[in-house]
Structure formats: C-alpha cells, structure tokens
Amino acid sequence: MAVVKCKPTSPGRRHVVKVVNPELHKGKPFAPLLEKNSKSGGRNNNGRITTRHIGGGHKQAYRIVDFKRNKDGIPAVVERLEYDPNRSANIALVLYKDGERRYILAPKGLKAGDQIQSGVDAAIKPGNTLPMRNIPVGSTVHNVEMKPGKGGQLARSAGTYVQIVARDGAYVTLRLRSGEMRKVEADCRATLGEVGNAEHMLRVLGKAGAARWRGVRPTVRGTAMNPVDHPHGGGEGRNFGKHPVTPWGVQTKGKKTRSNKRTDKFIVRRRSK
C-alpha cells in the first residue's frame, strides 16, 4: 500500500493525494452479497432535511458485511480483498469450508490465502473472532459487540482498534480510541487485530468535485445567509453578536447531546477532550 501525490497536470489534480493498494481486487464485487442502496438526500420520510450537506454522488451498491462472525468452528480462506464505497475500511471476501462466502472487515495484515476462524477455540491471531472472555487482556481488537449476538458496533472504521485493559467476572473493560473506558459483557465477540487501510486518513480529495462524487454538498456559513435562512444571518458587518446556534436555534458549541442514561453505568471514564 502506498500514498501517492499526483502530479499538478491541472488545478484539480495539483493537491490530490491518494492511497494505492495493488492487492485490492480489480473486478466486480461478489453479486450475491450486494443490495440496492437508495440515496436519501439527507431527507426523512416526510421529505424534510434531517442531515444537511448530503445529496447527489455516484450510485453505489451496498455490500452485505458479516459483523456477527457467528460461523463457529468452520475455517475460512480469504479469497480476495476489495474496495467498499460505503466505508473507509477495505473488506475481504472469505470462503468457508462448507462453501458459503461472506464479506468481513479486512484487518491490518490480512491477505489472500490466509485462514481465519470464529468461536471459542479459534487461535489468537489477527482476523479470528472470539468472545472477549477468551481473549488475553492487553490485546488489540476491532469490530466489537456491545450486546452478545448483536454484531460488531465499535472500531469498524479504517485504522481503528479497541484495547482490552481488564476483565472482571462477567464484564471486560475496553479503552476506546477516543480515550473513553467502557465496560461490556465478556460474552460479546471481537475480532483480533486492528482494522486495515489506516492510510485512509492521509488521502486528500484535492477539489470540491471529488467531495460531490461522494455525495457531500457544500457547507455554507450561517453569517453568510439572510435572516430568514439562519439565526446568524443578516446585518451589515460580519459579527452576529450572539451565542452560536444551529439553523434551528439549538446551541452548537459545548452543549451536551448524550441522553442515554440507561447505559451511563457502563462508562468507567469519559472520553478525552
């Protein structure tokens, strides 16, 4: 895998930095594991914008990724690594011994021909999935479940990982990349190693059009709008003279948004600022 800076053959290419991985499959994805992925344009079922700056972009098919990794005791061979337009991480197509194929998140160091396995008897090596009560303390894991059997929810983006720092009876304590320390049930599964494609963070799109290809629309400052469009709009100068708010009048800097008291007891230490 290499980080390549493009030659300035045009203004749009001058600042482009891309990640090149010659090991990625160059053909079409595995058709039985594809689903239609309709674009919402950031609108809900009432047609109202619920998420701004979304719209357009290239058509994409959704790859059905196995986040549960629940085929216990059946070894699988990695057939190939693939690009996935729906996430920052790459995915791997694996063939199980019983003939079934599934997509999984590609951990760092995984390559075609490698063997992986799930279950309590799986070896402690990157790509294998086990309940966290069977994983040594201090190990680095990804695709971590928060409820047994629900499928991985933590550490799924490119280059991310979680560290198991303690095990106490029915719970393990995890250190997340944000600095948060959190308890989850020891029967929750996790995949050993960290997610691959860590160089994803080094890429530079180089021009606004590349963001539009990805379905990202422009972000306009509230102070540049009219009063009818935003609480910061209007006025003769640039100062809006009030506390920063969203277009709907909600405080936007420092206001707490978390309201899940039910799971507060599982957070040992809050994330670092």
Swiss-Prot record:
Belongs to the universal ribosomal protein uL2 family. Part of the 50S ribosomal subunit. Forms a bridge to the 30S subunit in the 70S ribosome, contacting the 16S rRNA. Interacts weakly with S6 in one of the 3.5 A resolved structures. In pull-down experiments interacts with CedA. GO terms for molecular function: RNA binding; rRNA binding; structural constituent of ribosome; transferase activity; zinc ion binding. This is Large ribosomal subunit protein uL2. HAMAP family: Ribosomal_uL2_B. Residues 39-48 have a biased composition (Low complexity). One of its GO terms (cellular component) is cytoplasm. Residues 28-53, 221-273 are annotated as: Disordered. PANTHER family: LARGE RIBOSOMAL SUBUNIT PROTEIN UL2M, RIBOSOMAL PROTEIN L2. Changing H230Q: Loss of peptidyltransferase activity in reconstituted ribosomes. No change in rRNA binding or assembly into ribosomes. This protein can be partially replaced in vivo by its H.marismortui (HmaL2) or human (L8, from the 60S cytoplasmic ribosome) homolog. InterPro entries: NA-bd_OB-fold (IPR012340), Rib_uL2_dom2 (IPR014722), Ribosomal_uL2 (IPR002171), Ribosomal_uL2_bac/org-type (IPR005880), Ribosomal_uL2_C (IPR022669), Ribosomal_uL2_CS (IPR022671), Ribosomal_uL2_dom3 (IPR014726), Ribosomal_uL2_RNA-bd_dom (IPR022666). Keywords: Acetylation, Ribonucleoprotein, Ribosomal protein, RNA-binding, rRNA-binding. GO terms for biological process: cytoplasmic translation; negative regulation of DNA-templated DNA replication initiation; ribosomal large subunit assembly. It comes from Escherichia coli (strain K12). One of the primary rRNA binding proteins. Located near the base of the L1 stalk, it is probably also mobile. Required for association of the 30S and 50S subunits to form the 70S ribosome, for tRNA binding and peptide bond formation. It has been suggested to have peptidyltransferase activity; this is highly controversial. In the E.coli 70S ribosome in the initiation state it has been modeled to make several contacts with the 16S rRNA (forming bridge B7b, PubMed:12809609); these contacts are broken in the model with bound EF-G.
